[in-house]
Structure formats: C-alpha cells, structure tokens
C-alpha cells in the first residue's frame, strides 16, 4: 500500500501516522515477514489496563503467543485486546483514505481505534502492536521499576526474540 493520504483530524494522534509510515516502509523496502511494533500510542490504554500492563492488538495468534511467552519471561504484563472491525468504521473519511483518529465520535475504544489505524497499513502481514501508553512512566518505585521512564517492553522484546529463535522463527 502506498503511504496514503490521511485525514489528520487530530494533531495529537500524529505518532500513529509515523508508525503507519514505518510499517509501510518495513513492508515495501525491507521485505519483512512479520511486524512487532511498540509505541506509546494512546492514553486510553492506561484507562483500560492501568500502568503495569500494556495492551496488545494482533492479526496473528501464533505471533501473539510468542510475544506472550516473551512477556512472561520478562515479567512484563500484557493483555490482548480485540481488533474490532465495528470500531474501524470511525476511521472512514469523506476526503481521504483514512482519518487518523476517532475525534468527534462517541464510540470510545480509543486504544483499539489507534491500533486499527496501524492495522490498515499492515494488511495481511503477521503483526502485533503493543500499546505502552500507560506503562512507559511511573511515579512510584515498585519491583524492578524506579520512578520515571522505565523502559517497559525492552525486556519483553528481548525475550520474545529469544522465543522466536528457539522456535525456529528467523529473527
């Protein structure tokens, strides 16, 4: 898919545009056969899951299982949420291929809508999106985490790549 024209109806949702461009570039120029992306995409994910668990959205159960194993090994929590096609419709635009947010809509599900935007560019490539919007920063010390930016997801990705290698998936 070309880096298509988007209706930027929310200037606070620019990160998902950059992420969509990165996904498109990876597919078209690098020939990737799976995509694992991680981003502080929405505040809505913290409302849903709190600040110690990231949200995961995927189109591929096998890839999700590998990331779940990596998360468990890293002691970082994730929760899979649905890619709800009923929420996808709020991204339809009258003037472009796609709106970049559900701004002006009352449907809610903003973390899902953000992931659905990125999913448009993934198409059929096995993909998982980890929304770390609620987990990137903490104001309290707890376990391995100290106050401030905590690097949530770094250990998870490292452990996931080890799982992939062990299972014979080319990393």
Model-found features: residue ranges?
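A generic structural signal for tightly packed, nonpolar segments enriched in small/aliphatic residues
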Residues: 2, 6-171
């Amino acid at each position: 898919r070309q880096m298509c024209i988007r209706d930027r109806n929310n200037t606070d949702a620019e990160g998902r545009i950059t992420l969509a461009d990165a996904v498109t570039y990876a597919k078209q120029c690098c020939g990737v056969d799976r995509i694992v992306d991680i981003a502080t995409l929405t505040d809505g994910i913290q409302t849903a899951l709190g600040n110690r668990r990231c949200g995961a959205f995927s189109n591929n159960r096998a890839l999700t299982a590998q990331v779940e194993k990596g998360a468990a090994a890293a002691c970082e929590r994730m929760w899979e949420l649905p890619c709800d096609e009923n929420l996808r419709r709020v991204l339809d635009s009258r003037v472009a291929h796609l709106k970049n947010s559900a701004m002006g809509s009352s449907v809610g599900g903003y973390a899902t809508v953000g992931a659905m935007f990125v999913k448009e560019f993934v198409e059929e490539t096995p993909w998982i999106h980890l929304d770390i919007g609620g987990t990137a920063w903490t104001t309290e010390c707890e376990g391995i985490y100290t106050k401030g930016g905590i690097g949530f997801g770094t250990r998870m990705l490292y452990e996931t790549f080890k799982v992939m290698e062990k299972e014979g998936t080319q990393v």
